[in-house]
Regions:
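Conserved class I S-adenosyl-L-methionine
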Residues: 1-53, 68, 72
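Short glycine-centered segments of the SAM/dcSAM-binding site in methyltransferase folds
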Residues: 58, 154-155
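A short acidic, Gly/Pro-enriched loop at the edge of an enzyme's catalytic core
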Residues: 115-126
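A short SAM/SAH-binding and catalytic strip from SAM-dependent methyltransferases
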Residues: 126-138
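C-terminal alpha-helical "lid/dimerization" subdomain adjacent to the S-adenosyl-L-methionine
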Residues: 157-209, 213-215
Length: 220
């Protein structure tokens, strides 16, 4: 990945959670105007609900971000072995501090590139990928690596931004967010992602809210 991505997320570290969680008036206004009022909190809850509270296997969270949506879930997953990877050192620092405050001890944080995951083949029972694929610069490598480290019969669950649902959102993604380094084209459409996933997975859940797709799939 590029230094531009590192720098873009370093610059946004103080507003990242506010935007995702709609916790300020300006973040709610931004989400309403440019994202059609989509509530990332609700989407995240749906995705995280695909993971059983009593899960006791190995889970990879990539990118972990700040852990704002996952910390509460991980706090009750005592039997799980969780690996949290992100390219951004700033995101990892925030996640580490959040997990420390929540006394979450079953998460290992790793700085790394989703396009070259430092794990063996078929290492994980679940791969969770929230708000990442619209930012990953080499999406083909990312898809390949996620598939490689997931066990056959394992679960891929996630959500991210897609194009083709709103002209206003598409403009924001290509003209603003991509230029800032927060997003990286090309972007999937609802149908292109479905076709891609169906080549290697059974789609158990596949939905969209505005320009956000969320899903649960089982690797064949």
């Amino acid at each position: 990945m590029s230094d531009k991505i590192q720098e873009s997320y370093r610059q946004s570290r103080n507003i990242y959670d506010d935007v995702l969680t709609r916790s300020t008036w300006w973040s709610r206004l931004y989400m309403d105007i440019f994202w059609g009022g989509v509530d990332d909190n609700e989407t995240a809850r749906k995705v995280i609900s695909y993971i059983p509270d009593d899960f006791s296997g190995k889970l990879l969270d990539v990118p972990v971000g700040t852990g704002v949506f996952t910390a509460a879930k991980y706090a009750v997953m005592d039997g799980a072995e969780i690996t949290c990877l992100d390219y951004s050192v700033d995101m990892l620092d925030q996640a580490r501090e959040r997990f420390r405050k929540e006394e979450i001890s079953n998460c290992r944080l790793v700085q790394g590139d989703v396009g070259a995951l430092p794990f063996d083949d078929a290492s994980f029972d679940i791969v969770l990928t929230m708000n990442g694929f619209h930012a990953f610069p080499d999406k083909e490598k990312a898809y390949s690596e996620v598939n490689r480290v997931l066990k056959p019969g394992g679960t891929l669950a996630g959500c991210f931004c897609i194009r083709g649902e709103s002209r206003r959102t598409d403009w924001l993604m290509t003209r603003i967010l991509s230029r800032k380094g927060w997003f990286t084209p090309p972007f999937e459409t609802f149908e292109s992602l479905k076709a891609r996933l169906e080549r290697g997975y059974r789609l158990d859940e596949y939905h969209k809210e505005g320009s956000i797709v969320y899903f649960k799939a089982t690797k064949r």
